[in-house]
Amino acid sequence: MTQFLPPNLLALFAPRDPIPYLPPLEKLPHEKHHNQPYCGIAPYIREFEDPRDAPPPTRAETREERMERKRREKIERRQQEVETELKMWDPHNDPNAQGDAFKTLFVARVNYDTTESKLRREFEVYGPIKRIHMVYSKRSGKPRGYAFIEYEHERDMHSAYKHADGKKIDGRRVLVDVERGRTVKGWRPRRLGGGLGGTRRGGADVNIRHSGRDDTSRYDERPGPSPLPHRDRDRDRERERRERSRERDKERERRRSRSRDRRRRSRSRDKEERRRSRERSKDKDRDRKRRSSRSRERARRERERKEELRGGGGGGGDMAEPSEAGDAPPDDGPPGELGPDGPDGPEEKGRDRDRDRRRSHRSERERRRDRDRDRDREHKRGERGGDRGRDEARGGGGGGQDNGLEGLGNDGRDMYMESEGGDGYLAPENGYLMEAAPE
């Protein structure tokens, strides 16, 4: 189809000129010719220097070694500072240390918010206080957490030393000790490597977790005797007594916890048993009411049949009233013979069957309501039916045995049967027929 295009369009489809060939700048890899083939390094070994003339290798420091070196240098530097400060430290020439050293009490671990008046109020119970000196930082002016209390009498200081240790002040338990800087020879404070604490001796395997006056291991490195050596046994006994007291408290708390758990489980079981007992009693009451209702229904139906039979047998008199369905026995028939449409006829049986079916399908609430209504009707009928019964008995005959049941209908007959039982029995009581007392 392109050959039919005009020349101006055919010019658009014309091919371009070929790319001009230029010779390569370098030879191709397969065209290169090496003067020498590949070889080993054996010819060049003689050019290497002798290993015996080489300088020894320099060993670099690892990270662990560098940290250990810095720690060691820090310890050495601190030891030099401690030695320098120890030469200048003299507690006897301290301007802040005034008063009698044997009447002065050292109080540590004090809350930073505790004031001097609070300390005085807490420690005046052991005796009159002469002076209280709280230590503050020289740089920031904040409290350091310890103080010195000077008593007027040495016996008061001994009493506070014995009883005030571990006392809680502002939420913190303080540590109480005597002033050892001026009383113990060669004593050094904590910042200069001394003190009673053992929490800065070294690593975790050397340090103790809790420092205090009751630590017996702190006396191992003490150069001089204690100013109160007879108090050591008392401190040991007090410490053991406190430990035993803490153990007894823990054991008592564990027993209380177990007792609470047992009481809680017992209450839960008792509550469950009571709930199950209530459910069982409800079920038993419901079954008992159902059985009683069935027995009363059966007894009532039996009494109805017997009354109908008795009324049909005595219907030979002229005063017999027609029943609700109008099926009274004929006057000229025999006294004990029932008519074709008597009380036991198919219509009466059908009505009894329908009535029993309807009553059996009633709920418990409807049955209770019917019984209450029947009881009320029976009560009203008993109040106003005395004269009527006497009139009927006075004008009775063969139909006097009917007692007006045929004219009352089904509801009236039911009420009457509940009040009078057949064959010399009274009305049923709790599902049982009661025999009438002989006259």
From Swiss-Prot:
UniProt-listed GO biological process terms: mRNA splicing, via spliceosome; positive regulation of mRNA splicing, via spliceosome; regulation of RNA splicing
Residues found modified as Phosphoserine: S226, S268, S323
This protein's record includes keyword Acetylation: yes
Positions of modified residues (N-acetylthreonine): T2
Primary localization class, coarse: nucleus
UniProt biased composition (Basic residues): 255-268
The UniProt record lists the keyword NADP: no
Disordered as annotated region, ranges: 48-79, 187-439
Functional summary from the UniProt entry: Component of the spliceosomal U1 snRNP, which is essential for recognition of the pre-mRNA 5' splice-site and the subsequent assembly of the spliceosome. SNRNP70 binds to the loop I region of U1-snRNA.
Protein name: U1 small nuclear ribonucleoprotein 70 kDa
Organism: Bos taurus (Bovine)
Upper classification of the organism: Eukaryota, Metazoa, Chordata, Craniata, Vertebrata
Name of the encoding gene: SNRNP70
